[in-house]
Amino acid sequence: MLRANYHTHTTFCDGTNTAEQMVQRALDLQFDHLGFSGHMDEEIYMDWDAYVAEITRLRETYAGRLDILCGVELDTLYDPASCPGAEYLIGSTHYVDVDVPFPRAIDYSEEVSQRLCDECFGGDWYAMCRAYFELEAQVYDRLNCTFVGHFDLITRFNDQMHAFDEQDPRYTGPALEAMEHLVSQGVAFEINCGAHNRGRKAELYPRRSLLAALHDFGGEIFINSDAHQTECLNGSFDVAVERAMACGFTHVNVLAHSPAGSVEVHQLALDML
């Protein structure tokens, strides 16, 4: 079993449980590493100093039992200077770059996504997807992120493909262009289990066809639960490992503190999990 997660939310942002409750759950699951990744974006702005202080306290309290890392999930449109001292950074794109008087997060609700498409892209979902992936392609340049979060989040409400066809070249073209560009920059991607483990999507992020393309491009992966509740901390890890191996991946990346205290990237063999 994979015993690490680096996409973890708490009551500091939009999570249900406290950071210490997440630590206790990680210990119950016999985790080796737990990374916290509170949101910092225009709709969820944490008390950064309080967050860092609590994660630091937990790291010291549970030293020798669990390797605890202090990260952040930062949106492409936000400033990395807002989170000084983060040990790792998830680069996520939750928005399209438009000026509207209502929430512009593409995972806010199905109704908001449709309104964004109608009012900003003339009802053309493929145009909105292109704009999304053009912004996604900039995530490493803008944030110098450790890995890319939920790459195809724009499909959040599209499991039945009623809004757009995820096999259509008008969708796959911009998605693959962004993915290939990011892989060429050396940044890893996560397999994000969050919508799957909460019963919101049948697919993981990225979907199977894009995950296979990521392998073919030479990309590297993390596997994360995107947990907002303790019960989801390792949710759908078994599915993610199986799909990664089916797409040709042999290893998964993990982050760990070195003896000197720096954060290092290691790899684990998927067939040993």
Model-derived regions: residue spans:
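Charged catalytic cores and adjacent phosphate/nucleic-acid-binding surfaces used
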Residues: 1-8, 19, 156, 161-273
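A metal-dependent hydrolase metal-coordination microenvironment
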Residues: 2-130, 232
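Domain-core and long-helix interface of multi-subunit machines
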Residues: 12-13, 93-96, 101-217
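A generic secondary-structure signal
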Residues: 25, 57-58, 135-139, 243
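Non-catalytic positions within long, well-ordered alpha-helices that form the structural scaffold/packing
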Residues: 27, 82, 140-141, 215, ...
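A structural motif
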Residues: 31, 86, 144-145, 219, ...
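Hydrophobic residues within beta-strands of alpha/beta enzymes
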Residues: 34-36, 89, 148, 189, ...
